[in-house]
Regions:
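Active-site histidine-anchored catalytic micro-motif
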Residues: 1-234, 238-243, 247, 262
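A short catalytic or substrate-binding loop motif that flags glycine-/basic-rich loops and adjacent residues
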Residues: 250-253
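Short beta-strand scaffold segments in enzyme catalytic cores
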Residues: 256-261
Length: 263
């Protein structure tokens, strides 16, 4: 199965030259570290691409990456795994890691499904960055929606049973949406405090209690559960920003953050 890019030329440059130029200009230049997982934003690159590239370029991107993001369209299963084939990117097609996909869908938690992915942007905008940083990367795209904390933990356990030391989990999430900059910074700070504390329960309680529209809170919770099972004790915030710094509109912003979950 071949997934044609849905937002190429809209959320990120269509041409490989422009995409490469953007990525190369925003590389962190920091020494590469080994990570269990990273959290990257997924808005248009003009708004959140700097944060995504800055964070991803600090990490050694292995050949196997599991991408987990929110399902914005409502199509498909609650946990939808793209099973096989490849995804179009400006740098050539990114192959699906069908072996890992099969291991995930062998569980009752996950469903082999393409409907959830056809028009979903949350993972697509990240794939070109990964493909540029490691041309040999193979991806397992997973979207999710409406999961309880218990299901997130169960998914974390599944990931721990499937992933080896050469697998990176990438969480796709923006932070709070469409409030003023002050409110967004306050809400984002509270959610990020839970993320950095590696506390998936606190993240769920905080997001719900403070009405924080962090669209990737569910995959973030699953990743935190996974990382703790793999022995993670440190999460690092690489950058926290919002769309107002680009648009000039501080009355209605979206927050973005990059996080590295260290081995």
């Amino acid at each position: 199965m071949f997934r044609k890019a849905a937002v190429r030329g809209l959320f990120y440059p269509a041409s490989p030259e422009e995409a490469e130029g953007f990525i190369s200009e925003n590389m962190s230049g920091a020494p590469l570290c080994e990570a269990l997982a990273v959290m990257l934003p997924h808005a248009g690159w003009i708004y959140s691409g700097r944060t995504a590239v800055n964070t991803a370029s600090r990490v050694n991107i292995p050949d196997k990456v599991i991408l987990m993001g929110p399902n914005h369209t409502g199509l498909g299963a609650r946990i939808s795994v793209y099973p096989e084939g490849s995804w179009e990117t400006p740098f050539g097609d990114a192959a699906i890691d069908s072996e890992t996909a099969s291991k995930l869908t062998a569980s009752h938690l996950c469903t082999a499904d393409t409907a959830a992915h056809i028009n979903e942007h949350s993972l697509e905008v990240i794939v070109p960055i990964l493909k540029y940083l490691n041309p040999n990367v193979r991806i397992t795209p997973v979207t999710m929606m409406g999961l309880s904390t218990e299901t997130c933990r169960a998914l974390g356990e599944l990931l721990a049973s499937v992933c080896d030391d050469k697998t990176l989990v990438v969480v796709s999430s923006d932070m709070n949406h469409f409030e003023n900059a002050s409110a967004t910074e306050r809400k984002d700070g509270a959610a990020l405090q839970a993320v950095l504390a590696l506390d998936e329960k606190a993240l769920a309680v905080t997001v719900s209690g403070m009405n924080i529209s962090m669209c990737g809170a569910v995959p973030a919770a699953a990743a935190i559960s996974y990382c703790k099972l793999r022995g993670c004790t440190k999460a690092e915030l690489t950058e926290h920003t919002h769309s107002g710094f680009v648009s000039g509109d501080y009355d209605r912003v979206v927050g973005y953050a990059g996080v590295i979950f260290h081995k």
